[in-house]
Amino acid sequence: KRIHEYKRQLLNVLHVVTRYLAILENPRADWVPRTVIFAGKAASSYHSAKSIIRLIHDVGLVINHDARIGDKLKVVFIPNYGVSVAEVIMPGADLSEQISTAGTEASGTGNMKLALNGALTIGTDDGANIEIREAVGDDNIFIFGLKTPEVRALRLSGYQPMHYYESNPALKAVLNALSEGRFSPEEPGRYRSLVESLPYGGDHYLLLADYASYVATQLRVDSLYRQPVAWSEKAIANVAGM
């Protein structure tokens, strides 16, 4: 898929870093191992999207080489995404991340292909996620975040992303780690403008507003994955429903 701000791959990165920091804080906890796979292309002149791709690489480089993490968390970016790559990724995926801001996504088919191959979807109530939810049932999909009318209402009321930054310690720690160069020590300011565009720059796609719901829903994913029979039942329901 495309790497684009509205698709919010950056929100996925925020969760990855949240998970990384949490593992470091409590390494003896019974963590569900997670390999997070990114794949996609950005328009050649789309600076923010290119910066997100580079950030994914840098975050992966730090996490994948941190001996304290071991196999609890890995981050991979697969280049040159296309049909041939998708044919490998989609059958092997457990979880499909479809996390665009509600009201921005057209009804695509990538998420449907993943569901047809047995991946459970974590996503917003947007685009074809709505059709998948209707096809497989509310209990067989992980929906989080603001819905389209709520997005509209929040913007009209005067969205204040700094409120979310200041009121959520985990979110604040993640944004500070990225902004201060923890994942780009050779160039500490590399991602400062990208990250600071969220609390200070208006956060047009409402990443900070949906962050807490997204992280909480990822914990629900972990909880279900600890129950292989229940997970398999939901995966089968997705295949059958699609």
Q: Model segments located where?
A:
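Hydrophobic beta-strand segments of well-ordered beta-sheets in folded domains
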Residues: 34-36, 95, 121
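Catalytic binding pocket for nucleotide-activated donors in carbohydrate/polymer assembly enzymes
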Residues: 91-92, 99-240
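Long, K/E/R/D-enriched contiguous segments that form extended
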Residues: 1-87, 101
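C-terminal, helix-dominated tail/subdomain
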Residues: 37-40, 94, 148
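A short structural micro-motif
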Residues: 6, 240-241
